[in-house]
């Protein structure tokens, strides 16, 4: 059955664009989304996760940004979060990346660092307790009790352990992050990596003064000092894999640290990054109408365009977009739109949006269902998409 093209299919949203070294066939991006389909030791469930990304790379020329991976043993603490700091992790991700490439699509692997808290049940067994007592726990600039409380939990698992972050700790993080980026690109075969300065996590916490002056003097106090960690990390990663293989994500409207200078901080960061790394693959910014910590934040008078204008091209916007807002945003020069919930519930999302087809509704109860295929690989493709595959 032929699918009738609609007027909207001529929107820039559905037109090709070059991002970094990649020639994409449209401007709809799979947004990074934590899903907990991973073993407790950080080893991804390859067959399950491969099927998920294989489904969502069903439209050739799509860019997929993965869920966040921990770059090192001291980066995290959540159970069921994937990691990429040893050969076993690399071997588990290789088939996933290959499945995406087999569908003529592209993949950037995102890395993150917790802002210092560990989940409560991290201390439930002796092996993990030894890791904590030996210093193998997430780093935080403060050494103070967790500032976020219940604001940082997944499936009710709360985090709490903090450790003061020395200059040596910071350099160690930069090294492990860089090694993980090299594993992603040269080991797993990914097209690039995304650096995560988002929603109050470690890099964001530095930039937004989430710790006051309780840190090494070189990395706290003035905005220039607070930005140093991120810029040094970016420089190290770029030197290792190339600017065109690196994207950068920010959440300029997040109020986790309630920094009164948040706007100035993000403007400073964007200008510095653009000045030092003009060929970075993209800037990825979250809109103020994001869904975060159980609440929908809608601020009509604010959007990410001011940051897009500072940055230039290419630019990815994410957070609460539907088809209409995506089409509108894509009219901006060299702008892409990332989808999270709609992409997880619609494996053929770019096809559905292009032809204005009904969308599957997501099941929020399965977002963080550990190691389960339910609500992960069982969302149906549209009949119209399946019909086109029959014709082929």
Curated annotation (Swiss-Prot):
Keywords annotated in UniProt: Flavoprotein, FMN, NADP, Oxidoreductase
Residue sites binding substrate per the record: 196, 199, 368
Keyword Signal: no
CDD domains to which the protein is assigned, alphabetical: OYE_like_FMN
Known catalytic reactions: A + NADPH + H(+) = AH2 + NADP(+)
GO cellular component, one term: cytosol
Class of this enzyme: oxidoreductase
Binding site for FMN: 34, 196, 249, 341
Gene3D superfamilies: Aldolase class I (3.20.20.70)
Any coiled-coil regions, as ranges: none
Known cofactor(s): FMN
GO biological process, one term: cellular detoxification
Pfam families per UniProt: Oxidored_FMN
EC number: 1.6.99.1
GO molecular function: FMN binding; NADPH dehydrogenase activity; oxidoreductase activity
Similarity annotation: Belongs to the NADH:flavin oxidoreductase/NADH oxidase family.
Subunit note: Homodimer or heterodimer.
Protein known as: Putative NADPH dehydrogenase C5H10.10
Taxonomic source organism: Schizosaccharomyces pombe (strain 972 / ATCC 24843)
């Amino acid at each position: 059955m032929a699918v009738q093209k609609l007027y909207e299919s001529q929107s820039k949203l559905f037109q090709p664009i070059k991002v970094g070294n990649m020639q994409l066939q449209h401007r709809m991006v799979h947004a990074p989304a934590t899903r907990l389909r991973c073993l407790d030791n950080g080893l991804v469930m390859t067959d399950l996760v491969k099927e998920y990304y294989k489904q969502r790379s069903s439209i050739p020329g799509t860019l997929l940004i993965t869920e966040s991976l921990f770059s090192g043993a001291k980066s995290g603490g959540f159970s069921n979060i994937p990691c990429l700091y040893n050969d076993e992790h690399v071997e588990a991700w290789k088939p996933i990346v290959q499945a995406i490439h087999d569908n003529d699509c592209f993949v950037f692997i995102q890395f993150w660092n917790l802002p210092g808290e560990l989940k409560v049940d991290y201390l439930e067994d002796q092996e993990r307790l030894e890791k904590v007592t030996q210093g193998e726990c997430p780093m935080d600039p403060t050494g103070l009790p967790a500032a976020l409380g219940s604001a940082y939990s997944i499936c009710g698992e709360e985090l709490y352990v903090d450790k003061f972050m020395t200059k040596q700790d910071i350099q160690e993080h930069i090294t492990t992050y860089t090694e993980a980026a090299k594993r992603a690109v040269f080991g797993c075969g990914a097209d690039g990596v995304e650096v995560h300065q988002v929603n109050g996590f470690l890099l964001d916490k530095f930039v937004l003064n989430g710790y006051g002056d309780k840190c090494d003097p070189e990395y706290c106090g003035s905005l220039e000092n607070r930005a140093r960690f991120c810029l040094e990390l970016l420089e190290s990663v770029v030197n290792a894999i190339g600017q065109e293989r690196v994207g950068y994500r920010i959440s300029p409207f997040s109020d986790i640290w309630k920094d009164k200078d948040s706007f100035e901080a993000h403007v400073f960061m964007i200008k510095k990054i653009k000045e030092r790394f003009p060929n970075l693959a993209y800037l990825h910014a979250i809109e103020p109408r994001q869904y975060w910590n159980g609440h929908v934040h809608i601020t009509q008078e604010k959007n990410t365009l001011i940051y897009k204008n500072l940055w230039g091209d290419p630019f990815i916007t994410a957070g609460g977009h539907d088809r209409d807002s995506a089409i509108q945003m894509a009219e901006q020069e060299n702008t892409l739109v990332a989808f999270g919930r709609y992409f997880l519930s619609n494996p053929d999302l770019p096809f559905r949006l292009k032809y204005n087809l009904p969308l599957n509704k997501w099941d929020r109860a399965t977002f963080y269902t550990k190691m389960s295929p339910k609500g992960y690989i069982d969302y149906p493709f549209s009949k119209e998409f399946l019909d086109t595959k029959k014709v082929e």
